[in-house]
């Protein structure tokens, strides 16, 4: 069986594991392991007036911080504290909190909601600022995620990814659904529903579009789906298989895997479907392309050495220079994804008959396994490079999971009674 057939069958079988009736609701269940004393203690008070709000903003903030694995929540009691209230920072420090958050949620005359908050450093006894966020009711959860991102940035020194989105595929009642949700799996909505499989969703760099492969016409075709409008464009409908779309960092080009010439090869195509050009040359199976963050290189899976391994070539194709092998740990490595800073490579390695998520330092080439599961697939880096989202199985059921790049923090995103696969973590919101 060819490499492309193996990879394709594994993807399709995984996404067809369980068919269920009724609605599927994503719920993030968090297991934080191995962090210990490295967690930052923070107290987030209930926000003033949020009891009358359709969303409990402070609760969402606490949940975001907890699931990051970098914070531990100190009990702030049930009394609401507004951002304008006087705060005894010494008392909160005595309770073990190194930071304190207060805020309010108010409905404006025009029906929108205003979230205000203030962050304090209790150790230094000073304010670390805050924000005023205005949104419609439907945007309140995202406002809460932005509060958590602000806190993360101020206390951790890097950008948070709470206000980002996920895409994934759920099969329910004989239909496949491409769903878009918040980073915690909540506020999910269906972008596409089809009786045929949907695979390989990939976010555009600006977060407004998702490319994917749909079998709705009884063959794999690559589409670009504009999320705000719902408009779709066919990017590749060539003879044979059209698969594995990957965006260039500038959003102008996609790399795709096509079998139009026989064996699957990697091509580049403009985002409007024009300008198709072949990038890999030869008789091997080349698939699963992924651009480097600077857009100068493409990583991909190839069996040119006999077994699937990950290679790197110029984004201009092999005519600009022969591809170089990247992975040397293990005899079967697939599904490359490069971290946003270009320093790490996530991929799936076959280990003892199972498939596990690995991460490799691209400078030192050291490879490390990150999971204890054996059905891992489809890795996707968070926009800040601190976490990797992937699909796996727990108790025989397809779930999504996220793990920190040091392997210490793990999260599981499961669908009650159903199976969820094909994850992709979206970029920072514009």
UniProtKB/Swiss-Prot annotation:
Keywords: Cell cycle, Cell division, Periplasm, Signal
Annotated signal peptide: 1-26
Coiled-coil spans in chain: none
SUPFAM superfamilies reported for this sequence: TolB, N-terminal domain, Tricorn protease N-terminal domain
GO cellular component: periplasmic space
Record localization: Periplasm
Key word Cell cycle present: yes
GO biological process: cell division; protein import
Major location (coarse): periplasm
UniProt KW Cell cycle keyword: yes
UniProt xrefs under Gene3D superfamilies: TolB, C-terminal domain, TolB, N-terminal domain
Protein role: Part of the Tol-Pal system, which plays a role in outer membrane invagination during cell division and is important for maintaining outer membrane integrity.
Quaternary structure and partners: The Tol-Pal system is composed of five core proteins: the inner membrane proteins TolA, TolQ and TolR, the periplasmic protein TolB and the outer membrane protein Pal. They form a network linking the inner and outer membranes and the peptidoglycan layer.
NCBIfam families reported for this sequence: propeller_TolB
Family: Belongs to the TolB family.
Protein's name according to its UniProt entry: Tol-Pal system protein TolB
Organism of this sequence: Paraburkholderia phytofirmans (strain DSM 17436 / LMG 22146 / PsJN) (Burkholderia phytofirmans)
